[in-house]
């Protein structure tokens, strides 16, 4: 018997269209990673004459990529990630995961504006590895 392996890819536009299509047709909200898998599975089924079934398992929350998902559904650009979370929830009637929705009230633990030269970064990594 021969074994075959198929590989596909999806552009950002195709990924966004898949998010919108799945939501429109099934009222199911998917994240971009799942959308790539669904898009590629659809392409496989279009190309290959098979009676095989495909199961796409979604493990990521669409709210982790709320800006991409919301823009895919509405085409609207908003100010920040928290606004996208709120807007995605309002648009779809879904509830964001509590750990994500509570982020806005959490204390910032790390300074996001640190900058290191490559040699300083290498020194930090070596020191941490000791």
Task: Report each predicted region and the residues it spans.
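PLP-dependent amino-acid enzyme catalytic core
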Residues: 1-130
